[in-house]
Design a protein with these regions (language model features):
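P-loop (Walker A) phosphate-binding loop of NTP-binding proteins
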Residues: 36
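Catalytic core of pol beta-like nucleotidyltransferases
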Residues: 1-30, 39-40, 44, 55-104
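Short hydrophobic/aromatic beta-strand micro-patches
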Residues: 51-53
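Conserved histidines in hydrophobic membrane contexts and catalytic metal-binding motifs
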Residues: 33
Length: 104
């Protein structure tokens, strides 16, 4: 990944919104950022945590999730971890609720 230690949350959100059509084409209907980058306490080596909802209930095929991750990584320069909203355990959903920033 490139040196993106100074990328702001606003820049991340803007880049995600720019590529939203390509992400939606992979079946993603909603996308939110959470974790250290959403909270504003990320380290230079922190990844980007993304929560998605998809057209179909359940998970997209793995290759589609990888494609979405690569789209995001190419746009932001950040290593990306994708979580599926439908597959999160309730305790995890509660833990990240305060961090969630809806992108689309």
């Amino acid at each position: 990944m490139s040196d993106v230690a100074d990328i702001t949350l606003e820049e991340i959100i803007a880049k995600l919104r720019e590529i939203a059509p390509a992400i939606r084409a992979e079946g993603v209907t909603r996308l939110a950022v959470f974790g250290s980058r959403a909270r504003g306490d990320a380290r230079p080596d922190s990844d980007l945590d993304v929560l998605v909802e998809t057209v179909a209930r359940g998970a997209l095929p793995a290759f589609d999730l990888f494609k979405v991750a690569h789209l995001i990584e190419d746009a932001t320069g950040l290593q990306t971890q994708i979580s599926m909203r439908d597959l999160l355990k309730p305790r995890i959903t509660e833990r990240i609720a305060d961090d969630l920033i809806e992108v689309f």
